[in-house]
Amino acid sequence: MPSSVNRTSRTEPAGHHREFPLSLAAIDELVAEEEAEDARVLHLTANETVLSPRARAVLASPLTSRYLLEHLDMRGPSPARLGNLLLRGLDRIGTIEESATEVCRRLFGARYAEFRCLSGLHAMQTTFAALSRPGDTVMRVATKDGGHFLTELICRSFGRRSCTYVFDDTMTIDLERTREVVEKERPSLLFVDAMNYLFPFPIAELKAIAGDVPLVFDASHTLGLIAGGRFQDPLREGADLLQANTHKTFFGPQKGIILGNDRSLMEELGYTLSTGMVSSQHTASTVALLIALHEMWYDGREYAAQVIDNARRLAGALRDRGVPVVAEERGFTANHMFFVDTRPLGSGPAVIQRLVRAGVSANRAVAFNHLDTIRFGVQEITRRGYDHDDLDEAADLVAAVLLERQEPERIRPRVAELVGRRRTVRYTGDPASAAGPPARERYAPPTAPAGHPARPRWIGVRLTPLPEPVTEAECAGAQRLGRLAGAFPHQIDSSGNVSFTSTDGRLFVTGSGTYIKDLAPGDFVELTGAEGWTLHCRGDGPPSAEAYLHHLLRERVGARYVVHNHCIPGRALETSGALVIPPKEYGSVALAEAVADACQDSQVMYVRRHGLVFWAHSYDECLALIEDVRRITG
């Protein structure tokens, strides 16, 4: 049985002895020591970055304790809504997010942006969950060819099979042999997920092979270069989605991002996130990401060009000093990282140990068909402003360690001296962008136009008891429609709402929090009329948040049956005949009025990021509409 009493650390430096649990003062001391050592290290890892002071400061903001929920399209002004949960919102952060979405359009050519992913792996899991099903096959990059070491495991844990691209001897995908694998394995998703690579991928050619199958490019390593117009341009070259973590060449916090131009794919991803993959998106980290996006907008082109120049220069300088660098004949690299072949230098772990003793941080990586290497990256020292002289000095120090010309401990003070000269973070955005009045003066809540009464966000409800509940016979048709609509594929959940008009002309709608797949007579509330912005209702509890929508459809077109589910029709939408309505806030007057305005033109409507709405004058007509769309959507 494990013991938690009087445990001592096994990782303390010589001369230190601590007992657990630590005192808070001891924790403060350890953090301070770690930070001090970090400031003396030459960071040449390819998978880390340094934040700007502005982005780092917001991580300690009081906002870190506040919730930022849902996608921007669905959040609405404060108070924010998540289903039936209402809470004070962060409207000013929404303004920043709206600006960051525009930045993504300009930097990446992406019409849609999803900032809620907590990490790159979380983005990968979201993509797998949204765009494939258990038993499907996902095509990935094999670990031996530079693929991420967890992709295959995540495929298995999600119940997916996997197959791999075929690479040739030049670290390049063999397109013809890969085509053969695709034709044999028929993957439902092509995922380009490399973590050890030097040159662009043939995205356009892979998309030609993929056809209608989604192609997802994971740019966790090169997102900052892509933002700066370098390396490659995945979305314009044919990738359906671009996803990444945001803390390598992209100089943001440890978060994830998904970008794309296909509305249906992005909405499927958004719904997948909203239905169990994320609640809080970690407010402070999200704001730091939004800041980094703006910094990249201002300085990304200069930064990306300098990163690639520095990577090639440092690789060449090491080669000139006798260090075996991979891919010399191809110019070493086209991105931020390069690889040293450890075979002439000793085992990879031993080489890394020497570097760490000298105060140099890098990664050992087994890649390129099992080649043991040390992976170096220059994105952090580039942001620190290292110039050619600094790179030559760094090459002297690293080569001396790799080639064992000096003991690492003798090199360590020289490394610390070099690092100490370059502490300022560069590429932090246009200084003029910070000018202007403070945010509290710039922000103003939306107001109604002069002379017009303010339209409320939500309809009011006046509830009285229902003398007699709905009978089984009266609601039988609505129950059957609810079961059918609630069982659609790609369904966010089995909630939603249904209304029907009884034979004596009374309008009934499902109550708040009911599930349309298993409705009972007691789940219905009668709508007896409306007065201004208030619905008069009779029932045991409040009606659905969308009750006003049902009231308006009854008033506008005489609808006797209305069914609203939470289905994402995806790409099948184009052939379903549904009229598409832009995203509107759940339960809002704006949503109800948008649907009521559109119902004159169609009996099937899709509210983006929300679900389908059907209306009809009879049960049989509504049943036929639902069955037709269900056949189309699978």
Swiss-Prot record:
**Cellular component aspect of the GO annotation:** cytoplasm
InterPro entries of this UniProt entry?
Aldolase_II/adducin_N, Aldolase_II/adducin_N_sf, F_threo_transal, PyrdxlP-dep_Trfase, PyrdxlP-dep_Trfase_major, PyrdxlP-dep_Trfase_small, Ser_HO-MeTrfase-like, SHMT-like_dom
The modified positions for N6-(pyridoxal phosphate)lysine read: 248
The domain of life for this entry's organism is: Bacteria
Which cofactors does this gene product need?
pyridoxal 5'-phosphate
Q: What does the record give under GO molecular function?
A: fluorothreonine transaldolase activity; glycine hydroxymethyltransferase activity; pyridoxal phosphate binding
| UniProt key word Transferase | yes
Instruction: Report which reactions are catalysed by this protein.
Output: fluoroacetaldehyde + L-threonine = 4-fluoro-L-threonine + acetaldehyde
**Which key words are in the record?**
Pyridoxal phosphate, Transferase
Instruction: Name the job this protein performs.
Output: Transaldolase that catalyzes the final step in 4-fluorothreonine biosynthesis. Mediates a L-threonine/fluoroaceldehyde to 4-fluoro-L-threonine/acetaldehyde crossover reaction. Can also convert chloroacetaldehyde into 4-chloro-L-threonine. Does not use glycine as a substrate.
Q: Which family does it belong to?
A: Belongs to the SHMT family.
Q: Which protein is depicted?
A: Fluorothreonine transaldolase
Question: Organism, per UniProt?
Answer: Streptantibioticus cattleyicolor (Streptomyces cattleya)
